[in-house]
A protein has these predicted regions:
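Nucleic-acid-interacting cores, centered on viral/eukaryotic replication and modification enzymes
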Residues: 1-384
Length: 384
């Protein structure tokens, strides 16, 4: 909360710093009390029982404290010394229900200032890593000037053991692995309605929460540090995308770089999910993209293509809108997001050609029609 100091590793941002004095006056104290007054007078939402059940699971994992009453929280932090974020549920693809802290509604996001914005690896990192391995082999083992040979000739001199693959790992409950600073614990509190107690309860979360703006930047510092150590100490060609680690390596290395990256993470206090481990191989689904490296040595090619399931999803959504003749701004936003991600894996991002009309519909005025216009029809037909 308040001003987040820069780590010096991400892109700098111009910022109007929120001072501790401003935070105490405008967010904590009487303002916090007013906000809590508003929460405790709210009726329970339709998801109250589900939220309470999910909270019990989080408590059992040791990620948070036990539910406390308002009086108990006041006794611990003092009146006006804490401020909660109401919880709601976001249902993800596949039906998974995730607890989200409403840090926007709680005012937490507004009262946060940051000096930097994060960056993450692009999927093309894998091709760059494979090219680096080929380039280093060329420098070390082929005659001087071999880098200027025609591609076919250069490829004919590459050994089989230079075959490359990629392995993937994912952190377990990643945000919860990043502890909250003790000074900020009073604002890293979530609120939910207990159907058993028939009253609002408040819980201190010991790790980062989904929904708080600063959580994303704060969390990403850890995998970036881990990646830097794995690269410099173990020469592991790994890259992080939030809580995902993707490691390029020679297949004959039998996953040693991937294993070393996991070892570094463990030494730093992190944990990977064994059920999400994907061993190093020439074909891999990475960040939702099908990556193929088996043609690298024969044709000098690394392929990136959208998963078949993603393509079918885009086609089905576009077809449904065309058949109904309507498209809401929310539906346009969802289709645009999915199609834009897939388009990033096409040559020249050609798939983006049909997305302008979806963007126009996404941001249209509230009083405008949801009917499919001629421009939107053309865009949907392109995607279908």
């Amino acid at each position: 909360m308040g001003h987040i100091e820069t780590s010096g590793i991400f892109r700098p941002l111009p910022v109007n710093e929120i001072t501790q004095e401003e935070l105490e006056r405008g967010f904590m104290g009487q303002e916090a009390e007013r906000f809590i007054d508003m929460i405790v007078t709210r009726p329970p939402g339709k998801s109250a029982e589900i939220i309470e059940a999910l909270m019990e699971q989080e408590t059992a994992k040791g990620y948070q404290g036990r539910p406390l009453s308002r009086d108990q929280m006041n006794a611990k932090y003092g009146v006006g010394g804490w401020r909660p974020m109401p919880l709601f549920i976001n249902e993800e693809e596949g039906g998974k229900q995730r607890l989200i802290a409403n840090a926007k509604g709680g005012g937490h996001n507004k009262w946060t200032s940051e000096e930097e914005t994060l960056f993450v690896m692009a999927i093309g990192f894998i091709a760059e890593a494979a090219y680096t391995l080929v380039e280093e082999y060329t420098k070390m083992y082929l005659p001087e000037g071999a880098k200027g040979w025609p591609t076919e000739e250069l490829l004919s001199h590459l050994p089989e053991w230079l075959e490359c693959g990629v392995g993937c790992d994912d952190m377990t409950d990643a945000f919860r692995q990043s502890p909250v600073a003790p000074a900020h614990q009073g604002t890293n509190v979530v609120a939910f309605y207990s159907t058993g107690k028939k009253a609002w309860r408040f819980v201190e979360v010991f790790g980062l929460v989904y929904g708080m703006r600063s959580s994303v930047l704060h969390f990403n510092r850890f995998p970036v540090l881990n990646t830097a150590v794995a690269r410099r100490v173990g020469a592991a060609m790994t890259g992080s995308y939030v809580d995902d680690f993707n490691t390029a390596d020679l297949t004959v290395a039998n996953g040693s770089a991937q294993s070393f990256n996991g070892h570094v993470l463990s030494l730093n206090g992190g944990a990977l999910g064994p059920d999400k481990h994907k061993p190093t191989r020439t074909q891999q689904v990475v960040l939702g993209v099908h990556v193929r490296l088996e043609r690298l040595l024969d044709e000098g090619m690394v392929e990136f293509e959208p998963r078949a399931g993603t393509v079918h999803k885009i086609q089905d959504m576009a077809s449904l809108m065309l058949e109904r003749g309507t498209c809401t701004p929310a539906e346009a936003a969802k289709l645009r997001g999915t199609a834009a991600w897939a388009a990033g894996n096409t040559f020249g991002r050609a798939g983006r050609l049909g997305l302008k009309s979806l963007k126009d519909r996404q941001y249209q005025a509230q009083d405008e029609t949801n009917e499919v216009t001629e421009d939107l029809r053309s865009g949907l037909q392109f995607l279908r």
